[in-house]
Design a protein with these regions (language model features):
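Bacterial N-terminal signal peptides that target proteins for export
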Residues: 2-13
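N-terminal presequence-like segments and the immediate start of the first folded domain
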Residues: 12-88, 92-105, 112-161
Length: 161
């Protein structure tokens, strides 16, 4: 009888270890891989990465464009204030889906009447949110956005755990 009990314990331990392994692999597979090939210009000083590799089988969420409106819907006429608020709104949207900034695979930003003078504000805000784990990013200059006082909008593709 003791021999049978040991065999059952050993079988149970093997089953437990086998079922635990895929979970450990899945958890590590949800991490994004940031890629900046040495054969290309280093984009990180400008606040983005060249590419982001999403693990196979990952769940993906798409966050709609977040503008610079505060919680009352008011927009500052100041570009820098709108950018800062838009990233705060993106942070709130990430929180709302249980995600973190390091899970953002790609950003698309829309800038009204873009010129080079705006790059510093854009870079400072993206680095404040993402640190050195900068997602891939595309900047699209536009003549206007959904509401006339809007000067900036950011949307995100997020890989969920």
């Amino acid at each position: 009888m003791p021999h049978t009990a040991i065999r059952h314990l050993r079988t149970g331990a093997i089953i437990a270890m086998t079922t635990a392994l895929p979970l450990a692999v899945q958890a590590s597979e949800t991490r994004l891989e940031i890629v900046n090939p040495r054969t290309l210009h280093d984009p990180t000083p400008n606040g983005y990465s060249t590419a982001t590799i999403v693990p196979a089988g990952a769940r993906v969420a798409y966050i709609s464009g977040q503008g610079g409106q505060d919680h009352t819907g008011s927009l500052s006429p100041d570009f820098a204030a709108q950018v800062k608020q838009a990233y705060a709104n993106l942070g709130a949207a990430l929180d709302g889906i249980g995600a973190r900034p390091d899970q953002v695979a790609k950003l698309t930003i829309y800038v009204v009447d873009h010129d080079m003078s705006k790059l510093g504000v854009l870079t400072d805000n993206v680095k404040a949110m993402f640190g050195d784990r900068l997602p891939a990013q595309t900047l699209v200059p536009v003549p206007k956005l959904a509401v006339d006082p809007m000067l900036f909008e950011v949307e995100a593709i997020v890989v969920l755990d």
